[in-house]
Amino acid sequence: MLILGLNGNVSAAGADVVPNLNELYMHDAAATLVRDGVLVAAVEEERLNRIKKTTKFPSNAIRECLAAAGAKPADVDAIAYYFPEDFFDDIFQQLYTEHPSVPTRYSREMILERLRVDLGWAAPPDILHYVPHHLAHAMSTYYRSGMREALVVVMDGAGERNCTTIYRSDGAELFEIASYPVPKSLGMFYLYGTRHLGYGFGDEYKVMGLAPYGDPSTYRDVFSTLYSLGPNGTYELIPRGGVVFRMTTILREHGLQPRRRGEPFTQAHMDFAASVQETTEQIAMHVIGYWARSTGLRNLAFGGGVAHNSTLNGRILTSGLFDEVFVHPASHDAGSSEGAALVVARERGERVWPLPRLTNASLGPDLGDVDSLERTLKSWSPLVDVERPDDIVEATAHLLAAGEAIGWAHGRSEFGPRALGNRSILADARPKENQTRINAMVKKRESFRPFAPVVTAEAAGDYFDLPETVGHHDFMSFVVQVRADRRELLGAVTHVDGSARVQVVTEETNPRFHRLVTRFGELTGTPVLLNTSFNNHAEPIVQSVDDVLTSYLTTSLDVLVIEDFVVRRRTELPLALEDFTIGFRPVTRLVRRLADVSAGRPGAPEVSHEIYLDHTSGPRATISAAMYELLTHADGVTPLGSLGIELTGELLTELYDLWQGRFVTVAPVGDGAGSAP
């Protein structure tokens, strides 16, 4: 039986289902394909449409999942969706009242339309099944844990009516034993704390990285007024049901002004972040601890967006409450697409247990065969030199040992927000300056944010204090302590509090990556690398060969290693761009504005030009008149140098900056860079 699991909303690639759709509506779009209970393929739509945390319908992800399975739409027996139908339709009804010009249509009709229009799939209405949200989360994390009897905890921003649901399993079925209503949401509590620090939805991990620089005792008394812990794992957020909306007011009354985006961080901001993290941990541990003790269950499967708080997970690991803890690599909403598929499989009589523990998250599309890869690399030859060493792992290990920062792309991409050795940026984990160096070269992000280490399973205990509780460190899910005698050595990956979000790689789960870390250890004496996601600040993790080359060419990484090839820049950008085509993403928009010419203002009206990405929180940039003219002539087919526009150095630099910000696409002639905006 072949079952397709989906999440995301029904927006088409170039437009939202209603104007200015909120980023919280059906985020983290993804598709998952399950065959006879086995996870065949899974990929987030953001990897393909290049919009972080996209809400768009996952048409591209569906296409890639089917391709990975060698299947056609007609082979699919059922489609599972990660929220109930009436809940989804109620959301649409609310949106229609806010946008009366939008025709009233509902989810089943619109999902089937997207399948037909985007994929040519005339799916029958009864192929579509809807699943309760938290049950989908619970199924994905429990049935991939390898556990039999377990406590299953789902914590996130919100399901239909609940923010936390507790289950227990006897090895065959999940039984719901408790739930907590949405007004008590720890996910929303953390989000509003995140917004107070000048960040937005999806930036919660930045607050987690900032927290160790702060002292939670500074504002502990203030935060203690926001919640109370009760008996039997209960708690209240104070004022009841309204803390997330009143947090800013309450904190302002205590002298804590919200930070504006782009402002420097003060110690007060760091102390505030520490308090947000501490409060979240206190409440979560109160809930999880009670249910662990009351059920007597010694195994925990933890899911939902809150389960990506790896600092909290580290605390669970050291609490002594459990013998084993499993966190799904895609615990956020993307992973619920898999859980929804498993629910439907079970409802249709398929046995989905027992399943072995998930140890490898490499479930996305690969980079193609060698011939297609060579053709693509050759098409980019005006910008890069390519060589094929006899032993790519040996060559890469020597480059890393020599201090090079490397983009590393191999095999199928990872499912979830972590780069685990298939779409990674790698560097020596020892020099402390590598943290600031990688930030400057690639990420252009806040200097306080830590990088993660990857270590071989054979050496993990020599460098990190791994708790006795089995934590399964395959997916960077847990923050642990770096051994005190190793912290100075591992300067690039040891956080300010001596911690690290460690990945342990084994020969069985990722042979090539394990061999690379092992060989680096043989050359340097330290089998630990800095491992961070392969992307710049303006994009999701890279997926395709063109994504990989684009990211490499718009950062300052020293070398790119893609499959068995070593790639280096051969010329200085942006001067060589004239031989390439310029195109546009489906969400790219160009605007020319005339200033308001009120009476009495002499002269011609002032003109300004802007480019922006038309999606929630999409960036904007002011562009020159010359750039506006260039982009209005670009068609994704004609080389830049043949457009009849004078290409000054200043104009090419401006174009390169737009490419770096992913406002435009650049492609070799013949590849097609996208249509006009």
Curated annotation (Swiss-Prot):
Specify the domain of life of the species encoding this protein.
Answer: Bacteria
Q: Which UniProt keywords apply?
A: Antibiotic biosynthesis, Transferase
Looking up SUPFAM superfamilies in the UniProt record yields:
Actin-like ATPase domain
| Pathway assigned in UniProt | Antibiotic biosynthesis; novobiocin biosynthesis
Q: Which GO molecular function, any one, fits this protein according to its record? A: carboxyl- or carbamoyltransferase activity
List the GO biological process terms: novobiocin biosynthetic process
Say yes or no: keyword Transferase present. Answer: yes
What does it catalyze?
A: descarbamoylnovobiocin + carbamoyl phosphate = novobiocin + phosphate
EC numbers for this chain: 2.1.3.12
Q: What class of enzyme is it?
A: transferase
- In Pfam terms, one family for this protein is Carbam_trans_N
Q: Which InterPro entries match?
A: ATPase_NBD, Carbam_trans_C, Carbam_trans_C_sf, Carbtransf_dom, NodU/CmcH_Carbamoyltrnsfr
**What is the similarity comment for this entry?**
Belongs to the NodU/CmcH family.
What does the record give as the function of this protein?
A: Carbamoyltransferase that mediates 3'-carbamoylation of the noviosyl ring to produce novobiocin, the final step in the novobiocin biosynthesis pathway. Novobiocincin is an aminocoumarin family antibiotic that targets bacterial DNA gyrases.
What is this protein called in UniProt?
Decarbamoylnovobiocin carbamoyltransferase
What's the source species for this entry? Streptomyces niveus (Streptomyces spheroides)
